[in-house]
């Protein structure tokens, strides 16, 4: 059996990374052992509340259901047991909420995308909210290391009567370690389909050539922490005005609009701390006025 390097091999020293993670003679991520993990979660409802109808998991992804309110299922937590994502890895997550299910899906910790040789890491997330289900996709941040390569896609399917809140956020470089991106590739796609019709498509891309120009105001204006949040439900106007009212008080740039029957908000901050603080503030206020549901700060964010 081929031995898998532990996460401790991914140190701050790039030369150490190459020595430990790359076998002699390999010049591509294809020559290395890579992860192909996936999970599927299907949720419905019963007299007791949300029920788990089906769960599938393939290493290195694990799915946990911490019980925080007696026997009720309110939160699903995804764990990447490999400790991070490397070039050539492929990870897929599928979540479907049906009937009157109410669930928040988050991650145990921030996801780390390590430096790659040539191949991109591929991360695909598919979210489906049907009937009168309420689904919140609230993972913790994704930290993109210097010279990492990431292709990520978020596909969402919603139907009239359902309610959904989805968030994805990126940290470009390990700013807490003083690291800044000098090169790297990030491709981030969103596709949202409502009642079988595409209502919103968005693509964000960073290449090696773009990284040196982050300081430009037309690009990121030196912001290294960015996020996109999307809401669909019956309280569109109220949620839109709430975020607009909060925006001036946040420790980051924030813009929000109503498009395609969705509330779409963008956030950009100079530090991960500022962005996390802003998102916590928005989520704490966002659920106010809505029926009891998953649209709050996940408990795992405080662990």
Language-model-derived ranges and their functions:
Residues 2-141, 146, 153:
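N-terminal, charged/glycine-rich beta-strand/loop interface patches
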Residues 62-65, 114-120, 147-149, 175-179, ...:
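A short, polar/proline- and glycine-enriched secondary-structure boundary/capping micro-motif
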Residues 97-99, 107-109, 129-131, 139-141, ...:
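Short, structured patches in soluble enzyme cores that scaffold and shape functional sites
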Residues 102-104, 134-136, 163-165, 227-228, ...:
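Structural motif
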